[in-house]
Each structure stands twice: as structure tokens, then as C-alpha cells.
Curated annotation (Swiss-Prot):
Reported function: Removes the formyl group from the N-terminal Met of newly synthesized proteins. Requires at least a dipeptide for an efficient rate of reaction. N-terminal L-methionine is a prerequisite for activity but the enzyme has broad specificity at other positions.
PANTHER family: PEPTIDE DEFORMYLASE (PTHR10458:SF22)
Keywords carried by this UniProt record: Hydrolase, Iron, Metal-binding, Protein biosynthesis
Cofactor note: Binds 1 Fe(2+) ion.
Gene3D superfamilies the record matches: Peptide deformylase
UniProt protein name: Peptide deformylase
InterPro entries xrefs: Peptide_deformylase, Peptide_deformylase_sf
Keyword Iron: yes
Catalysed reactions listed for this entry: N-terminal N-formyl-L-methionyl-[peptide] + H2O = N-terminal L-methionyl-[peptide] + formate
Residues that coordinate or bind Fe cation: 92, 134, 138
Encoding gene, per UniProt annotation: def
Signal peptide from the UniProt entry: none
EC assignment: 3.5.1.88
Length: 178
């Protein structure tokens, strides 16, 4: 397994729409394993393949309590139904150090393939619903800052660009924690 570079906003590759996975094979499973290792190393709870520069519809998540690991791999995930609305603070490994309130569906039903290529469906609410929506947004080229006002987006972009100049964050991969 390998730790991959995490792309940092405003890297244009974060805006690409990921291609569906045609076949779940050893390469896709290796990608998922590398993404999990990268996510754990960065102390995140979710990571989309587009965040590591791979244009495939693959997401990894782990919402377990600290210390316990319950990795989840979603291949070709899609949301089937949304209900309600809830606002909560979100962060992103591609926008390190920034957290903002974002409104999302309170409950969702989604489907995906597992790491063996088997289809499955699940209903989710709370943190899991937020995380699934956030990561699928990445696969569609959308970031949580897109839900913010233009003023807030510009402020975050300027601050991140300053961190890049200071060498604390490297566009194309993280070199430090913001």
C-alpha cells in the first residue's frame, strides 16, 4: 500500500467528473487500499479518487470511533433518494484547515458496488449521509466550498494560496497540515 498525494483546492483536477469503474479488479482494490491508507494518514473520514488525481468513481470512508477501523469502499456510488435538510460543519482533506456550515439532505438512500464488485444499497442519516454526499460531490467535480457564498470561497482560496506560498501546503499534494 502507498500514501498518495492529496490534491489541494483550487487544483483544476478537483473539478473533473470521474468516470465509472468498468470492472472491479485488483487495480481498483489496490487503489481503494492506497486511498484508505492515505485517508488514515491524513486523519480524514472520507476520500474520493479524484482527490488523489484518479479519474474513477471510487470512494473510501471510515466513520468508526478513533482507534477502531471500519473501512468502507464505495465503487460507482449513486444517491437514489434524499429527504429533509440539515446544516452542519464540513471540512475536506483537499481544503485543509477550513470548516464551514453546509446544508445537505438529512437522510439518503444510496447504492454502490463493494470491493468485490457486488452491488449493495443502504439508507444513511447523520454523519454517514453527509459523508456520502460530500464524497459523491467530489466524483462530480463539486467541492463543499461551492455551497458557500462567493465571498467565502474567495477568502478560503486566498488563504490557501498564502499557505502554499509559505510551503505549508503544496498544490498537487499536502506537505503539511494547515
Amino acid at each position: 500500500m502507498a500514501i498518495l498525494d492529496i490534491l489541494v483546492y483550487p487544483d483544476p483536477r478537483l473539478r473533473e467528473v470521474a468516470a465509472p469503474v468498468a470492472q472491479v479488479d485488483d487495480d481498483i482494490r489496490r487503489l481503494a487500499d492506497d486511498m484508505l491508507e492515505t485517508m488514515y494518514d491524513a486523519q480524514g473520514i472520507g476520500l474520493a479518487a479524484t482527490q488523489v488525481g484518479v479519474n474513477q468513481r471510487v470512494v473510501v470512508m471510515d466513520l468508526a470511533e478513533e482507534g477502531a477501523r471500519q473501512p468502507l469502499v464505495l465503487i460507482n456510488p449513486e444517491i437514489l433518494d434524499r429527504e429533509g435538510a440539515a446544516t452542519g460543519q464540513e471540512g475536506c482533506l483537499s481544503i485543509p484547515g477550513f470548516y464551514e456550515d453546509v446544508e445537505r439532505a438529512e437522510r439518503i438512500r444510496f447504492r454502490a458496488l463493494d470491493r468485490e464488485g457486488r452491488p449493495w444499497e443502504q439508507e444513511a442519516e447523520g454523519l454517514m449521509a453527509v459523508c456520502v454526499q460530500h464524497e459523491i460531490d467530489h466524483l462530480d467535480g463539486k467541492l463543499f466550498v461551492d455551497y458557500l457564498s462567493e465571498l467565502k470561497r474567495k477568502r478560503i482560496r486566498r488563504k490557501l494560496e498564502k499557505l502554499v506560498r509559505q510551503g505549508r501546503v503544496n498544490v498537487g499534494g499536502q506537505t503539511g497540515r494547515a
